[in-house]
């Protein structure tokens, strides 16, 4: 499905605003880049690199959330960035999640979403408690009565980032059961 003219316009405006804001607020985080300075041997190029890296970071994760919302707005019942999933998690559910993630990390099993969801739904939700951590989805949308929660990550996350993200996704299932 192609983007509508309105969506394209909103995305262009968003990018322009983010870049203009960055240009207005840009302050070099550090002038000490000895390795890069020795490697490139041109302090102006190092400063340019620092600026480009800063722009790339600005246009990084937060921009994906905003663009996701722009794309989804026209075809979903509702959509939000930084959505509070809510709900509670029991000790039994937490134990089930820890077990799934440990087995995946150790290579004892392959990921199988439907099976993991069944295990979580089977785990008792009795005496569930609210948790502060892991409650926020980067992006949420509801379409035709079905809820979708998204955790947006960079390409090729390391194993620790993967583990934390997988845990969070499984916790969302437990919270919304």
Which role fits each region the language model picked out?
Residues 52-55, 122-128, 152-160:
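Surface-exposed cleft-lining segments at the edges of enzyme active sites
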Residues 77, 144, 174:
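Residue-level marker of positions within ordered structural domains that often coincide
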Residues 1-89:
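Nuclease-adjacent, charged terminal/linker segments that flank catalytic cores
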Residues 72, 137-156:
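Conserved catalytic cores of phosphodiester-cleaving nucleases, focusing on short active-site segments
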Residues 83-144:
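Active-site metal-binding core of divalent-cation-utilizing nuclease and nuclease-like domains
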Residues 54, 58-67, 134-136, 160, ...:
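Short, well-structured alpha-helical interface segments that form or flank functional binding sites
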Residues 17, 21-22, 34, 44-48, ...:
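Generic detector of short, locally flexible boundary/turn motifs and exposed helical patches
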Residues 131, 156-177:
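Acidic, metal/cofactor-coordinating or nucleic-acid-engaging core segments within structured domains
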